[in-house]
């Protein structure tokens, strides 16, 4: 079993924020792969399903971004899993918008949701970094991260999320390189 957690803030007013792209990725994966209905569990919302032959628990923490690790740690301990069984989808300022990178281990790089996750489960989990781009000046970061995607970005957002959902089987199989390359090919088309 694997836990795939999408980071974001709960509530409709945050739903379209760039900071919630991890939640969006989980929603698309659940829809494309026919996951079970949402249940309230582990201080958040979960959906169970299969991707290929792998059982996957999708988790959207309801703790707000800065405490995301509490929900992830609780789910990991309940299922007696290791950090290596956890994948976290989140927004990344230091990547161009709609670019995807997979990374295992490392620090938080200023991301409070990742910092919380490290605090609760350690560093050795897989991260799906979803580029949101940097606004240029540090004074504009908060407004950018907590801002909605622009109308002009909607097509790219839908295409990128669809690519994540369509290529999720490679993540389930542990083939991070194939996941990234197939997404890049889909986004170039």
Swiss-Prot record:
Keywords: Cytoplasm, Hydrolase, RNA-binding, tRNA-binding
Chain positions of site Stabilizes the basic form of H active site to accept a proton: 91
GO molecular function, one term: peptidyl-tRNA hydrolase activity
Compartments, record wording: Cytoplasm
A Gene Ontology term for the protein's cellular component: cytoplasm
Active-site residues from the entry: 19 (proton acceptor)
Superkingdom to which the source organism belongs: Bacteria
CDD domains per UniProt: PTH (cd00462)
Enzyme Commission number, as recorded: 3.1.1.29
Residues that, per the record, bind tRNA: 14, 64, 66, 112
First-tier enzyme category under EC: hydrolase
Any one Gene Ontology BP term: rescue of stalled ribosome
Reactions accelerated catalytically: an N-acyl-L-alpha-aminoacyl-tRNA + H2O = an N-acyl-L-amino acid + a tRNA + H(+)
Residues under site feature: Discriminates between blocked and unblocked aminoacyl-tRNA: 9
Role this protein plays: Hydrolyzes ribosome-free peptidyl-tRNAs (with 1 or more amino acids incorporated), which drop off the ribosome during protein synthesis, or as a result of ribosome stalling. Catalyzes the release of premature peptidyl moieties from peptidyl-tRNA molecules trapped in stalled 50S ribosomal subunits, and thus maintains levels of free tRNAs and 50S ribosomes.
PANTHER family per record: PEPTIDYL-TRNA HYDROLASE
Family classification: Belongs to the PTH family.
Oligomeric form and interacting partners: Monomer.
Full protein name: Peptidyl-tRNA hydrolase
Record organism: Erythrobacter litoralis (strain HTCC2594)
């Amino acid at each position: 079993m694997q836990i795939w957690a999408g980071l974001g803030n709960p509530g409709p007013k945050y739903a379209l924020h760039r900071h919630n792209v991890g939640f969006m990725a989980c929603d698309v994966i659940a829809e494309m792969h026919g996951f079970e209905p949402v249940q309230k569990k582990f201080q958040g919302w979960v959906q169970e399903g299969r991707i290929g032959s792998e059982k996957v628990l999708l988790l959207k923490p309801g703790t707000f971004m800065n405490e995301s690790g509490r929900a992830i740690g609780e789910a990991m301990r309940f299922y007696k899993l290791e950090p290596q069984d956890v994948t976290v989808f989140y927004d990344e300022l230091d990547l161009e918008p709609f670019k995807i990178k997979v990374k295992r281990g490392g620090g938080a790089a200023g991301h409070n949701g990742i910092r919380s996750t490290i605090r609760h489960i350690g560093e050795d989990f897989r991260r799906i970094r979803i580029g949101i781009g940097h606004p240029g000046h540090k004074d504009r970061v908060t407004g950018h991260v907590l801002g909605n995607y622009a109308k002009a970005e909607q097509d790219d957002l839908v295409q990128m999320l669809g690519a994540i959902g369509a290529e999720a089987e490679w993540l389930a199989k542990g083939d991070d390189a194939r996941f990234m390359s197939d997404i890049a090919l889909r986004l170039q088309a």
